[in-house]
């Protein structure tokens, strides 16, 4: 058997998250079904699992296939079976584990105050936010190593809540005629819905609805003020570092 590394992008609006679902509407379901159609029976490992509605620009996968499959041949037959909502960007033979060998994961979140067309609604979140300075002040609180027990949703197999945030910042830009704030958070790994809870806390602070002290108390597991994640549609798994 050969081990392959696949880099994919997918439109999270068409799936119920990355993980396999009882109704077969997970990204993993689609990929494993496509592989099965080619006679390849292999579990597919992802660098990170994304929730319902969350997108990926560069998700990384590892799986095994029989030795008669070369990377070029497999790309040729697999890519059309994943389209149009999953795009196979790159495929190479590599002996590695997509999840355990990953060193960092980078997420981006797109938020605008005024969405001018419904056709971008699945891809840019729409909601109010305060000044960029306040957003970045809040984001800085999360850098470093923390126990993120109060910044996660229930579920998932992870038992260790400690994670490292290497960098977290926000900036403004224009995307298809929309002024957006873009959040970028880079960490070693993330708990379930942790990125969206972090961004929600920062947005609420920028709107002066919560204090910096309340964010710090939640980081230190003293009191949970933010319990509801920000909407999923603006979030992208942007890059995985190995």
UniProtKB/Swiss-Prot annotation:
Annotated positions binding substrate: 107
One Gene Ontology term from the biological process aspect of the record: tRNA pseudouridine synthesis
Stored Pfam families: PseudoU_synth_1
GO molecular function, one term: tRNA pseudouridine(38-40) synthase activity
Active site: 51
InterPro entries named among the record's database cross-references: PsdUridine_synth_cat_dom_sf (IPR020103), PsdUridine_synth_TruA (IPR001406), PsdUridine_synth_TruA_a/b_dom (IPR020097), PsdUridine_synth_TruA_C (IPR020095), TruA/RsuA/RluB/E/F_N (IPR020094)
Organism superkingdom: Bacteria
Claim: Isomerase is one of the keywords in the record: yes
Keywords: Isomerase, tRNA processing
Subunit text: Homodimer.
Protein name: tRNA pseudouridine synthase A
Naturally occurring in which organism (per UniProt): Helicobacter pylori (strain P12)
Lineage of source species: Bacteria, Pseudomonadati, Campylobacterota, Epsilonproteobacteria, Campylobacterales
